[in-house]
């Protein structure tokens, strides 16, 4: 993993490089920020940079034995710690017991969406945790000298999921580890960390990614055209996970545009019966969109509400729509205004969240479509 694999965050990347280059790496670093900011990718890049034998231009060389082991997720001095669901019958007690699943996650979903991890480990209704057994394993692993590198690195993903007993057991080793040991904590919510753990780290906030930086990443790393990359970056809202998901389904834009137009036309005509049919079709458990595709479609609808409002205001420089989307906006945008845009966006987000939580898709969509009828006929504020 290279620093350039993560879009944006240039100031943070420079700070991490300086720590390594000046040999001032602290015992424990905390990278914290919202999900989708590329924190784990940065942690992995920093770990590889620390292990690399001949870094070039502020990046790991990618060719030395240490870099090759990082690429294969097999470096003996890189340890990953992550929340698991303990299962005694399957003899699952620590991270190492499901290492192949973790490696699958890193390869297939390097942006680290938490919901994907729950699916991979088949968590069901259980909440993954970092247990006290894990702390025992960390303390033991820290007692051994590094194998091939001057540094031994522990990357702890979602340390806020650590049980109190585990956190207490790790306090001493995080504060006074063996020489050469570095802990990198990667947290979605630093406020949930045990204060005694939090206070022992050097902290770096990882913010959302600028649209221009996401656009460049989508062009150069995902092979999208400039227009499509710009649209996806606008929809993603600075979130790398959203951008990656949308890029994987970039061919859906035209399908979503046509479906959006039909829904809004029927809402304008107060066609409740037609909207009921659309809700039943899209929400059907067998032939419909499915939960993930519905999620992406509702993200698209939310963006269209915002874009049509901006178009209505006459600020074309801020609008990120295709020619076909603008053509529809030229006729429909007057119905999205200051009197309803906030509620439109809020209700679109509410429908998306309900579907993410496995609510009945047909009912959620139909309720949402009926609200659309009310909202687009609402007078300006």
Language model regions located:
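Residues immediately C-terminal
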Residues: 161, 176, 192
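Structural recognition of the conserved hydrophobic beta-strand(s) that form the central parallel beta-sheet
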Residues: 153-157, 170, 181-187
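Short, structurally constrained coil/turn elements
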Residues: 72-74, 177, 197
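Clamp-loader machinery-focused feature within the broader ASCE/P-loop NTPase space
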Residues: 2-165
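Conserved adenine-binding aromatic site and its adjacent loop/helix in ATP-hydrolyzing domains
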Residues: 140, 172, 199
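Charged, glycine-rich active-site and insertion segments that engage polyanionic ligands
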Residues: 1-49, 55-57, 65, 179-182, ...
């Amino acid at each position: 993993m290279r620093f350039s694999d993560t879009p944006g965050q240039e100031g943070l990347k420079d700070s991490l490089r300086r720590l390594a280059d000046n040999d001032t790496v602290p015992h424990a670093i905390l990278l914290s920020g919202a999900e989708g900011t590329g924190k784990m990718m940065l942690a992995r890049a920093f770990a590889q940079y620390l292990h690399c034998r001949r870094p070039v231009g502020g990046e790991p060389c990618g060719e030395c034995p240490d870099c090759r082991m990082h690429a294969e997720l097999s470096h003996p001095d890189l340890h990953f710690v992550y929340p698991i669901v303990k299962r005694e019958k399957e003899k699952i007690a620590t991270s190492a017991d499901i290492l192949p699943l973790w490696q699958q996650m890193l390869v297939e979903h390097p942006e680290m969406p938490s919901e994907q991890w729950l699916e991979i480990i088949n968590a069901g209704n259980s909440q993954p945790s970092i247990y006290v057994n894990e702390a025992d394993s960390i303390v033991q692993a820290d007692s051994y000298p590094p194998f091939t590198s001057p540094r031994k690195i522990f990357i702890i993903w979602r340390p806020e999921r650590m049980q109190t007993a585990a956190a207490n057991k790790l306090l001493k080793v995080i504060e006074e580890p063996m020489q050469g040991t570095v802990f990198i904590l990667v947290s979605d919510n630093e406020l949930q960390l045990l204060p005694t753990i939090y206070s022992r780290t050097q902290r770096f906030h990882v913010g959302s990614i600028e649209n221009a930086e996401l656009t460049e990443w989508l062009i150069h790393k995902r092979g999208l055209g400039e227009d499509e990359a710009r649209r996806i970056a606008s929809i993603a809202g600075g979130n790398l996970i959203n951008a990656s998901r949308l890029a994987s389904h970039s061919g859906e834009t035209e399908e979503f545009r046509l479906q959006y137009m039909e829904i809004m036309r029927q809402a304008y005509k107060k066609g409740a019966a037609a909207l009921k049919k659309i809700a039943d079709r899209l929400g059907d458990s067998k032939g419909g969109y499915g939960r993930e595709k519905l999620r992406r479609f509702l993200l698209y609808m939310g963006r269209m509400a915002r874009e049509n409002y901006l178009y209505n205001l006459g600020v074309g420089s801020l609008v990120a729509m295709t020619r076909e989307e603008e053509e529809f906006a030229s006729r429909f945008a007057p119905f999205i205004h200051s009197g309803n845009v906030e509620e439109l966006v809020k209700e679109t987000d509410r429908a998306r969240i309900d579907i993410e939580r496995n609510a009945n898709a047909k009912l959620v969509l139909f309720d949402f479509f009926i609200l659309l009828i009310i909202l687009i006929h609402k007078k300006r504020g």
